[in-house]
């Protein structure tokens, strides 16, 4: 239950006290389905078997056929990025970036330094936008009870805020509380409607809830700032227009006024990340220590991101690598990537490398013992691997990346966590915050590399036949495109996206996917309100929307709830 509203949390500077309530438990058993858990790339269905109050098995089903690979066949390779970028309106830049890299790899094109810097700044702005939106607007309400915030003592909340982050921008908590009260009094809760409150799994005090709710409202402004950063060199947001195979088209936007505008927005966003976002992530880690031991996986993979020169992967600011069984970071060999379809709605059951991948849909029926997803099951050397911010941060951490190591070690000390506890639901969210901090700092230096009037395009010519791939890190994780050019047009195009890695089904060897294995062991206090399951699912950032239906097959009842 929430702690006393009179607590001021000043005993230890910058560190909230541990929660006084134990995590809730239950003894329930049975099969439950969350369907749909919606996301930008389609609809997600999660089925779990609960035994004695814990998830014993889980099945993740992608419920929407994508088919863009079939759309791209016989088209001009130079146009592919305009199609692929429209796959997602949140990760609005990443598929375009990966597609041009893919064609450039096939045609052996090296882009000018100025173009590379612009692309890094666009990608950086994408990360800042997505991570802030995810933490506050897609994931925080799994931990924060808005109704409890209405009971908070405003003065105590100010004291708490100052103890956690003395340099944070001043926030009028009384006004924020009044705005929340207006929502409640109107009877039209909007995004806060239909949530699980009150629920025994929510452990924050009213003051902590008000603090994070106020930051939720403040973050709405910040996501607009980072979207504006995208538009300065990208032309617009969503879906930038300044990309092209061989470079970028925004040569005349690289001027003092534009650079200064970008820098001002970056500095405002960076201050929020360092003084609000990261301390809030530490607050949740302290308030929910049991979640540092839940929701983890064993294997991580990162393609790396932010090239600093033509030398890749050596020059990648976030390094490339793979971690198996939580060991050291090893070199990545993309030839060891295969996609399995034994449990997916596609013809056959042969595992293939993406370069020779086949998209041949064949829907049968949803049967968790057979085929149950439109997602394929990517594997690295036959093993499922998690991709995303945790993978990027841990690969960099184990490679001794100085900025990442300093950020992680500082957070672990503040949150009273160990490095191994990063492999968890709470660690996944922490990694996202720390990565945002590191990227924001690096972007300030990249701005100084821009050359007004400098070259932004490398001329090139189309080959009659070529093959290539483009590797990218989207905010959600490793993203790869593979192309086969035949007679100057696209003969075959394959995408392996982060959500496929993380939410894919079992493979040929019947090994569960990352989310399927991460959910095992999750305690569920009330299966009709499965906030604990959603905490781990949301921590992988599947862009949750609207309504969730939880079905109890024993009673044939449907419980309508909201995933905020």
Question: What are the residue ranges of the model-derived segments?
Answer:
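Mixed-charge (Asp/Glu-Lys/Arg
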Residues: 488
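Compositionally biased, low-complexity/repeat regions
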Residues: 471-474, 482-484, 492
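Active-site bordering "gate/hinge" segments
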Residues: 2-476, 497-564
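Short acidic loop-to-beta-strand element that houses the catalytic metal-binding Asp/Glu
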Residues: 214, 480-483
């Amino acid at each position: 239950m929430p702690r006393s509203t009179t607590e001021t949390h000043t005993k230890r500077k910058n560190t909230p006290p541990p929660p006084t309530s134990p995590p809730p438990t239950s003894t329930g058993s049975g099969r439950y389905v969350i369907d749909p858990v919606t996301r930008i790339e389609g609809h997600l269905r999660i089925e779990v078997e609960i035994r004695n109050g814990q998830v014993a098995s889980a099945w993740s089903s992608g419920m929407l056929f994508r088919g863009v690979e079939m759309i791209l066949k016989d088209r001009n390779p130079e146009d592919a990025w305009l199609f692929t970028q429209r796959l997602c309106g949140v990760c609005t830049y990443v598929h375009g970036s990966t597609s041009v890299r893919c064609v450039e790899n096939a045609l052996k094109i090296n882009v000018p330094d100025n173009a590379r810097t612009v692309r890094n700044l666009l990608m950086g702005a994408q990360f800042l936008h997505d991570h802030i939106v995810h933490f506050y607007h897609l994931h925080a309400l799994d931990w924060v009870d808005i109704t409890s915030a209405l009971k908070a003592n405003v003065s105590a909340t100010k004291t708490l805020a100052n103890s956690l982050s003395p340099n944070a921008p001043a926030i009028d908590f009384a006004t924020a509380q009044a705005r929340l009260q207006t929502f409640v009094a109107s009877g039209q809760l909007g995004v806060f409607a239909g949530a699980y409150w009150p629920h025994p799994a929510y452990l924050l005090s009213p003051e902590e809830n008000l603090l994070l709710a106020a930051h939720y409202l403040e973050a709405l402004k910040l996501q607009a700032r980072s979207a504006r950063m995208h538009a300065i060199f990208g032309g617009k947001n969503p879906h930038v227009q300044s990309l092209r195979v061989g470079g970028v088209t925004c040569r005349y936007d690289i001027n003092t006024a534009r650079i200064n505008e970008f820098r001002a927005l970056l500095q405002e966003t960076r201050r929020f990340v360092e003084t609000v976002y990261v301390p809030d992530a530490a607050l949740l880690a302290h308030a929910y220590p049991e979640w540092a031991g839940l929701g983890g996986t064993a294997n991580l993979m990162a393609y790396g991101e932010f090239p600093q020169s033509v030398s890749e992967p050596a020059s990648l600011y976030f390094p490339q690598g793979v971690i198996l069984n939580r060991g050291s970071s090893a070199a990545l060999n993309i030839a060891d990537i295969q996609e399995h379809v034994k449990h997916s709605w596609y013809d056959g059951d042969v595992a293939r490398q993406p370069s020779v991948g086949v998209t041949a849909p064949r829907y049968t029926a949803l049967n968790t013992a057979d085929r149950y997803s439109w997602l394929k099951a990517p594997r690295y050397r036959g093993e499922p691997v998690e991709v995303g911010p945790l993978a990027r941060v841990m690969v960099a951490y184990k490679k001794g990346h100085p900025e990442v190591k300093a950020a992680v070690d500082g957070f672990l000390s503040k949150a009273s966590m160990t490095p191994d506890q990063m492999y968890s639901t709470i660690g996944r969210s922490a990694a996202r915050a720390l990565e945002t901090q590191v990227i924001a700092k690096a972007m300030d230096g990249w701005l100084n590399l821009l050359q007004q009037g400098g070259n932004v395009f490398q001329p090139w010519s189309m080959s009659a036949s070529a093959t290539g791939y483009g590797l990218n890190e989207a905010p959600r994780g490793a993203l790869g495109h593979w192309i086969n050019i035949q007679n100057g047009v696209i003969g075959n195009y394959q995408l392996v996206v982060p959500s496929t890695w993380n939410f894919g089904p079992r493979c040929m060897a019947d090994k569960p996917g990352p989310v399927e294995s991460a959910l095992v062991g999750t305690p569920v206090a009330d299966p009709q309100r499965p906030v604990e399951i959603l905490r781990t699912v949301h921590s992988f950032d599947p862009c949750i929307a609207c309504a969730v239906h939880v079905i109890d097959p024993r009673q044939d009842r449907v419980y309508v709830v909201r995933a905020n």
